[in-house]
Amino acid sequence: LVGSEMCIRDRSLTCSYCANFHKNVYPELKKNFIDEGIISIEYKSFPLNIAALNASKFAHCENDGNSELLHFLYDNQNEWAKGSTAEEYNKNLIKVIKSGNFKIDEQKCLENKSLEDHILNDRIEGVKSFNINSTPTLLINGKKFEKSLTYKNLKKAIEKLL
């Protein structure tokens, strides 16, 4: 499994279960498997709504998927993932990103059509290739991980492949 890829398709940044995974499971996974070079992780976008799509745009736009911004967005999800219109979501999102001192050109990110296409194509690929219909969904070596996304379950699955 050394160098094997685990693909996390939990990038609906408005998904509370995804935020929980990112905050409570990912750190142990990173420490014990990613940092040790046993697995690598590739994030794919699977936005469930316009707020998640725009958050994904910011995470990729000038940061190329910068994990620091990704962590920040998950950690502050309750502050920005609220509103009844796209404008409200965007206003909250921009306010939270600025509070973290990230340097982002908001309009450039929001209006980036090729980036939007890339993010939406990740979602389409997930549906077509892996029958993904919800978040979080995790793939290990191209196969859906069907158990509860706890560190214990993931550790057991990874160790079984070693």
Task: Pin down the residues of each PLM region.
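Sequence contexts marking disulfide-bonded cysteines in secreted/extracellular proteins
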Residues: 8, 16-19, 62
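A broad, low-specificity signal for short, low-complexity segments enriched in glycine/proline
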Residues: 5, 18-21, 96-101
